[in-house]
Swiss-Prot record:
GO CC annotation terms, alphabetical: cytoplasm; phagocytic cup; pseudopodium
SMART domains given in the database record: EFh
Amino acids binding Ca(2+) 1: D10, N12, D14, A16, E21
Main localization category: cytoplasm
Pfam families per the UniProt record, alphabetical: EF-hand_7
Gene from which this protein is expressed: CaBP1
Name by which UniProt lists this protein: Calcium-binding protein 1
SUPFAM superfamilies: EF-hand (SSF47473)
BP GO annotations: phagocytosis; positive regulation of macropinocytosis; positive regulation of phagocytosis; regulation of actin filament bundle assembly; regulation of protein kinase activity
Subunit structure: Homotrimer (via EF-hands 1 and 2); oligomerization is required for its function. Interacts with G-actin in a Ca(2+)-dependent manner. Interacts with F-actin in a Ca(2+)-dependent manner.
Task performed by this protein: Calcium-binding protein which probably acts as a calcium sensor and modulator, contributing to cellular Ca(2+)-mediated signaling. Activates endogenous kinase(s) in a Ca(2+)-dependent manner. Plays a role in regulating actin cytoskeleton dynamics. Regulates the association of actin filaments in a bundle but not actin polymerization and/or nucleation processes. Required for host cell phagocytosis and macropinocytosis.
């Protein structure tokens, strides 16, 4: 399934997916309308930072979108949340949020995101993140 989706996105068939190919795909699917969010997700998937997503990088990412409705208005935020949730426990810690945004050179965003912790328990659930981000 991941391989078939990769091939669908890789329009020129060169074995790597460029940002433009991803942008065209999500536009066709009417998913992730915010370009800054799409760029952040792309950079997060592109682990080696070469400006393209190879099949291995895509396979690692595929789990975060598997079973998701790509036309869901919140799909970009849900994917971003899963990319930040490094340990996969379904809640974000301050360390996960800070590490993610620091890696992308926008650590000030981490402070804002931590405000999503509505109940003050030190973790951000997906629900809190979506509510805060809307």
């Amino acid at each position: 399934m991941a391989e078939a989706l990769f091939k669908e996105i890789d329009v020129n068939g060169d074995g790597a997916v460029s940002y433009e190919e991803v942008k065209a795909f999500v536009s066709k699917k009417r998913a992730i309308k915010n370009e800054q969010l799409l760029q952040l997700i792309f950079k997060s998937i592109d682990a080696d930072g070469n400006g393209e997503i190879d099949q291995n990088e895509f396979a690692k990412f595929y789990g975060s979108i598997q079973g998701q409705d790509l036309s869901d208005d919140k799909i970009g935020l849900k994917v971003l949340y899963k990319l930040m949730d490094v340990d996969g426990d379904g809640k974000l810690t301050k360390e996960e949020v800070t590490s993610f945004f620091k890696k992308h050179g926008i650590e000030k965003v981490a402070e804002q995101v931590m405000k999503a912790d509505a109940n003050g328990d030190g973790y951000i659930t997906l629900e809190e993140f979506l509510e805060f981000s809307l």
